[in-house]
Amino acid sequence: ARVSMGLALAACAACAGMRHKDEDPPPQAFYTVTAEIALARHQPRIAALQYAAAAANETDVQLLQRAAQVAADCLQPSLAAKVAARWTEVDPQSVEARRAAAQAALALYKIDQAAGHYMAVLRSSPKGTDAEFAALEIYLDGNDNVFGARQLADRLVGAFPSSEAALRVQGFATLRADDPAAAVRSFTAALAMPAGEHDNNDSAHRELLQSLARARIMAGDAEQPLAQAQNSVERDNTPANRLDYVLLLMAAQRDAAALQQLEILRHNTEYAPVALRLLGLIEFQEGHLDAATARFADLLRTEKYLDDAFYYLGLIADRHNDPEHALRLYAEVQSGENAVPALLRATTILQTHGAAPAAEELIDRLVEDEPGRAPEILTASARNHVEAGDLPRAVAILEQAATEYPDSVDLRYAIASAYEEQGRIAGSLHELSELLKLRPEDPAAQNALGYTLADHSRDLKRAYQLIERAYAAAPRNSAILDSMGWVLFRQGHIAEAEPYLRAAYAGDGGGDIAAHLGEVLWRLGYANDAEHIWAEAGAADGDNRLLKATRQRLRSTQQPSAPAGQPASPSKSPAPSPATPPMRLPAPTVN
């Protein structure tokens, strides 16, 4: 019955655009009722299409607002943009209509349009410019389009150059977009503003100072911010000051010092949960699974951060090849940012242990329960099929998902990757090229196409140019650093590739980057260093297929000798520029 209703609604949506021009349109209620039925039946595309049809010639502001909200909630920004355009036409003074138009434009990477709408919001909102910037800061912090958010913030600062609130937004956006040097400039400028809101708000001022210190560390200037934070602890030994110091040590990847400070902090009753959480995260990141288990078990006893504790204990059980225990632990993760990853990992366990129907049922439930993350969930489902060797099924899932969410960038990337897995390199490159046409200034799209060209030794000159543009926009992004190193390797510049790959690996020690760095070290004659990198990454990402294949391929070849006149091991410099990789761990709050 559900399938039949879905087909009927789909036919209604299709027919809405196929009527003869002389036919009377259905009443508005037809569209809104069928849209609400589609929502109840978890058919987001149909719901958004029906509401967009209802809004096309509508003057009822409440209906237009509902249509825009449904399109946005259903992850249909192209439809949301059309509805918002109609809404602003009907009510040109509506701040809400402008905001809806801005958010849709940002999702479509139409940055100039987004900036234009946001400028109208900021200038006309009855809440005031600073309040709107504060709301925008929160919105962008939860937006996955980090490069678009950064470019939007840059444009808004151009329009509001004397606004501390605008500079705050820019600082946080550039930091999330892996350009810490630019973030330093923004935070410094914000703090240099004449007496304003931050002077009357101690917590906001403290946050700006801490963010500036973190940005400086990530940009390669670690010593002074760390010394200042240490002095603050010595001068005023409060738990809050010590936590700030810990977070900066973590940003600088000085884990041993951070662990020492956290051991002190965990004896404070109020701060013990956050200290135990961070202790567990650091031990987990370092591969000390027994120590991490003890920390997270202690965290459970505090009855704080329970979802985090269960999630990481599940990952540890997973690493120990104890799937039944892992599944029980993942099932305890009830909410928060790790809830969906826990259940997705559970689907992988079920799929790989002969319970594919249960995995599919869990995926269906997840899509219904978390509609705002449906593309991510469906991509994970396809990945399970790739790992199981069922590429046709994976591609079918992704292509069907793309018809439901045609604006999803993540699905486009996943389709390109699946085509590549099938050996359809031309199809993969076409998909990425089309995406870049839609988002020509998106560093992620530039990097994806550039890397794929380089990985298959296609048009290396263009590959380098694309990656170079992405690198200029996000010089501390691990994926882009990896691509830069890999295209240099493909061009034969092996020694020049090493520092980029080292910087990438320092920021993200995943298997793919380890495979690339290890191969470069191997080709340079440093087989022992390559083996060390592979072993280190294998402990955390042992199922990585590229890592396994690279190790096997190179071990079957004769090891090259280290170049004459060079030291026994390569340079340990962490980056091609004097910058420290971004912080790997989240900065929690005390709860």
Model segments located where?
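Register position in tetratricopeptide repeats
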Residues: 40, 73, 107, 141-142, ...
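Canonical tetratricopeptide repeat
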Residues: 66-67, 100, 134-135, 169, ...
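Residue-level recognition of tetratricopeptide repeat
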Residues: 36, 69, 103, 137-138, ...
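TPR alpha-solenoid repeat register
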Residues: 63-64, 97, 131-132, 166, ...
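N-terminal leader/linker segments that initiate helical-solenoid repeat arrays
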Residues: 15-69, 73-78, 82-85, 89-94, ...
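Structural marker of alpha-solenoid helical repeat scaffolds
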Residues: 23, 57, 90, 124-125, ...
